[in-house]
Amino acid sequence: MASQVMRITLKAYDHELVDSSAKKIIETVKKNGSQVSGPVPLPTKKEVVTILRATHKYKDSREQFEQRTHKRLIDIINPTQKTTESLSRIEMPAGVYIDIKMKQK
């Protein structure tokens, strides 16, 4: 018997937004009676950009900016039609990227 798995990946620059969104998704799935695995924290991606403060010279004067991308992974095992409909109705905060994939296990 093959089971289906719905894999949800959440990405955002603010870790609190990712955690609150994951909590909303897990509460909704548990209300509908499906099994949940997660949230699994994935490695944080850190991007650093270095620029010169001055326009022409003074190479020793630099400034660094960084951007961190936080990720969480949630697996829903054997999702029902009711579960997928309720997930589509959830209000998510702006700034959270959601990627949903279905897999056969």
Curated annotation (Swiss-Prot):
Keyword Phosphoprotein among UniProt keywords: no
GO MF terms, alphabetically ordered: structural constituent of ribosome; tRNA binding
GO process annotations (BP): translation
Origin: domain of life: Bacteria
Assigned GO CC terms: ribonucleoprotein complex; ribosome
UniProt KW keywords: Ribonucleoprotein, Ribosomal protein
Self-association and partners: Part of the 30S ribosomal subunit.
UniProt function note: Involved in the binding of tRNA to the ribosomes.
Family: Belongs to the universal ribosomal protein uS10 family.
PANTHER family: 30S RIBOSOMAL PROTEIN S10 FAMILY MEMBER
Descriptive protein name: Small ribosomal subunit protein uS10
Lineage: Bacteria, Bacillati, Bacillota, Clostridia, Lachnospirales
